[in-house]
């Protein structure tokens, strides 16, 4: 399609592109409405043909239909078609966006395998990246995706794009082992240069990078071993799928190439596995579990790949060990519940993939990251113990709801990984934050890896634990979340939203399971991204907290996991929340604050929540629709219809569930999805839990509202994400900023944003759920605008600054500024939130949270504002510099004054005109001097002026010119006059004339001369010499002068006349 995109751009594809644009808008609308969710099965069937038939257009349709074709995710053909379409789109986008398209191309193309379900949002993402090729298409793309992607693609233009993608990959990496391939390739590439767009290219190359490729080989080998451990064929198949998907998602080129090369045959197997996944949700779950495990292994491999540069191998080895544990745990889990393990494996894998994030470990604290993972690993092991207990219930819950969600979640996880890879694209802010954190990312990544690594044991041990491990991850991230409190709170919103969002996303997953997982993973990713971003400052606390939080997390996980064994995943989210809260007690408080803040935003932000909730609810609503879509779209996830509903309720309930009332509900239902989101948002979700405390009733509303607009909201979910993200920044003020940085940016990252937005919306929507329901619809379309407006509106109250700042940042420098603000601001936010936590720890969803949130919002907004103001101040400085430049113009004007001086000098020179040369020289000299000093337009102008003046001065020049002409004329005149005068002087002229005329006179002089009168012949002869008067003179001397004169004419006659006169004189003399 690259050629086609070029050739077709000139020829047919233009209309196709227009169709794509139309389809993109339609797809956006459809994605919003997700009415196609019902037709997803058809979309499935048609999805592949759409991709295959209309690779570009079809891909756009198929991509838009992938929303409905969520099930297609598991369909390799459609995924491959999506890959073609993605590749086409990617190529197209490569044409337009260049790297981002390419990056997304690979990512999406590979994601297409898993992300057929992700396609719904990724429809926006994937075919919208294609749209990125088409700026018009970009608009719909921008609506959801553009925030992040545009920032990422457009804002970084490639740098942020890359960074965004790279760092989003990082979040994806965090979220996905798969993306970690992408992210890890970037991590390997990016950690080397996070902001590096080239690293993004490298990261694309990293996809293909030998480093990534050979490393994925080892990781693949390890995962293969692990796969063999878990189930050689299934995991190998799933691994191939995951490796392929991960390779596709994470290192589309890298492992995708390596793994795809390796998995190329497996790709067929992956297609088979995907087909199997399509065929049976349980198989997909197993395959996904395998995929997840393989993705974990792939993640491990990817982590190894990413971390390979630094610690990935160590961490990867640990991860490899963890994956081994995971395999053991997964084997146990598989024994317990393959699907449970699927969800756990998925979660684990997602987080293990997040663990793959150990690329961070690679960078910052490879040892540190590794060591905390050890603590966390110990904790995960502990958690594994409690989670193993929980796993039994989780097996039931997971098998029951989790199996359903497992498939969906796995689908989501795969897709989410894909979606996260996309959302990696989406997390421009996150990536921006990551860019900011790029310096920090090592810590963050390390922390994430630690988190991931530590969680990987726990996650691996318990997939229910996976939530708990994810909590650990979140704990690790939560430690990251220590700084992540903001990030995690933002992500927590994302995660908190993800429960809803994930529930919503579960619904959305129905639409775009990817979105769910994306949201969950995005939440995780956002969390990780933000965690990675924010964790940098947090990391210090994070390390201490990581260990504390690890034990706390382990305890919390165990307690929550055990306590919520029935609701393992939700418990994990709760545990995550508790862990997030606990491991970052500030985070807990942050979570509480977040919840309070979110609640406050709920009341306060109700307006925004109406927007946010509207957005979030749209997500929620879309999730319901999405659930249907998911159910329809994802055959494996079809079970999810109840789950989506459950998730919808649990989503709504998830917030309460986090409180622990709905946890049982939510966990089983939204467990898988929430597992990711909860894990991601565990700490972050806490706001949801707190919010859910106040929102318990509202979340149901949201489900209802969500249910009512399931189809519409999905797209909107994607779109609202920016709004939600903007709102999330609000809610999370400081975290919100990181969140908004990731979230707002996620315009492209809308998936991630959606989780945040849903969480935010969920948190905010408790009060404004009904409002949101009505508002969200408009907002989704306006999501981007809404992002500005809702965020502004909400933030106008308390966070007007943060929202504006977040939005401006996301809009302006969303990735850069936000990342800057997020790291700088997020820690302040984290600190304030931590400070707040003391007051906020009580979860009263009443005023205190609200108060807290305003406080948090205001401090955060102040800090962000300060940061942003600082950025703005520097911008004004530049402007001032420009004004100074304007003064430079004044300086130039001063040379103009010099012109006057030059004129004066010229005038002075003018008096000297008399010596015209001197006058000219003087004028030129002064002018030249005047001109030289001005150096610039003034000089030129002065020269012009001077020249004109000089001309006037020179006026003599005209005279000079005249002189040459006049001189010639004068010379001629003189010659004539001279001759005449001479003749007059001779006075004999008459005689001379007479002499030729009358020889009589001569006869008088001498008769002999009279005969010469007939001398004309001789005169003729002399006439030849006429030219020379001298010749005539000799002739005259000869005495023939008279004849010569007669023969001669004109001047010669005159000259000869003189000569003749002389001759005559001589004759007379001689006669005398």
Swiss-Prot record:
It is found in: Cytoplasm, Cytoskeleton; Cytoplasm, Cytoskeleton, Microtubule organizing center. The modification N-acetylalanine is found at residue 2. One of its GO terms (biological process) is microtubule cytoskeleton organization. Tau/MAP repeats lie at residues 869-899, 938-968, 969-1000. Phosphorylated at serine residues in K-X-G-S motifs by MAP/microtubule affinity-regulating kinase (MARK1 or MARK2), causing detachment from microtubules, and their disassembly. Phosphorylation on Ser-734 negatively regulates MAP4 activity to promote microtubule assembly. The keyword Methyltransferase does not apply. This is Microtubule-associated protein 4. It comes from Bos taurus (Bovine). The lineage of its organism: Eukaryota, Metazoa, Chordata, Craniata, Vertebrata.
